[in-house]
Curated annotation (Swiss-Prot):
Organism: Pseudomonas fluorescens (strain ATCC BAA-477 / NRRL B-23932 / Pf-5)
Pfam families reported for this sequence: PGK
Name of the protein described by the UniProt record: Phosphoglycerate kinase
Pathway(s): Carbohydrate degradation; glycolysis; pyruvate from D-glyceraldehyde 3-phosphate: step 2/5
Quaternary state and interactors: Monomer.
GO cellular component terms, semicolon-separated: cytosol
Molecular function per GO: ADP binding; ATP binding; phosphoglycerate kinase activity
Key words of the record: ATP-binding, Cytoplasm, Glycolysis, Kinase, Nucleotide-binding, Transferase
Binding-site positions, substrate: D21, L22, N23, R36, H59, L60, G61, R62, R113, R146
Amino acid sequence: MTVLKMTDLDLQGKRVLIREDLNVPVKDGVVTSDARILASLPTIKLALEKGAAVMVCSHLGRPTEGEFSAENSLKPVADYLSRALGREVPLVADYLGGVEVKAGDIVLFENVRFNKGEKKNADELAQQYAALCDVFVMDAFGTAHRAEGSTHGVAKFAKVAAAGPLLAAELDALGKALGNPAKPMAAIVAGSKVSTKLDVLNSLSQICDQLIVGGGIANTFLAAAGHPVGKSLYEPDLLDTARAIAAKVSVPLPVDVVVAKEFAESAAATVKLIADVADDDMILDIGPQTAAQFAELLKSSRTILWNGPVGVFEFDQFGNGTKVLAQAIADSAAFSIAGGGDTLAAIDKYGVAQQISYISTGGGAFLEFVEGKVLPAVEVLEARAKA
């Protein structure tokens, strides 16, 4: 994968537009999870150190395109960046006609989705973005799977289009985990539905030695193997699909589970052997025996890919399975890569971020890369590098 890298460019005195993924949760005007902002800081600092006039852009939330909405404003992000960088980071709302930024200074552009044509990747808007800069830097892996004005279109028209350090590191890490993984390789794929992760499961079944499933996905595999799942979430129409995947790769199934009679924070948790699951039980986590077995599998792996918590870890009584596996990944000597929104929240909760080799900032983009799909924003950078 050959792309031009920001780290190789002379940015002194250049106007540099950096597309970051600053789509963070905000409550009452305050950023509540800063992982994506923290991930973007090294790129922003490097551009400033290189003497660039830095312009940063991102989307936040899902506003009606072309309309301002206060709840989707990047103002809280500008405030956060100002504190993190120890200097004022002005939020500029009206920038498409041109902006004055001095070398060594930084501004944050207001939400790109307030611009008409952003999501449709309109050439006219992309050309306006491109006219703002000498160098466009795509650093938002989390939106690389979307061909939008600020992720794809601008890269077609900018004088120079390069990958930022965060995007480049992401591509390198994913290439290492998926291109030529050290064996044995284990993957954890969890989520509510097989249907939403079918391509991921199929893709990983071709390169993995162990495919550990969790959540509603595991329930479908359990039902496919003839085990009772009570009133748990599962997909009866995908039992044959689950069997076909299990025929291609080792899919270890839970021997015990944690069940409840209702899905609620106050629900009483009971550990049961899988054969003892009653008709009115909901499976909300893997049991301690299963967690220990899966942890042993991870211990002997040399590559681990983790996407999704294996239980409803937001409720502590259904979090032990995810906690044990998170710790097993942290303790492992394997090259480990983790991605997907809920996965990041679990990593935060159990404090294992420092012990995971690479944490992907992309949710949908991470999954599409794992599926083997071409990411439009990366494809255009490759095309520009060849040209």
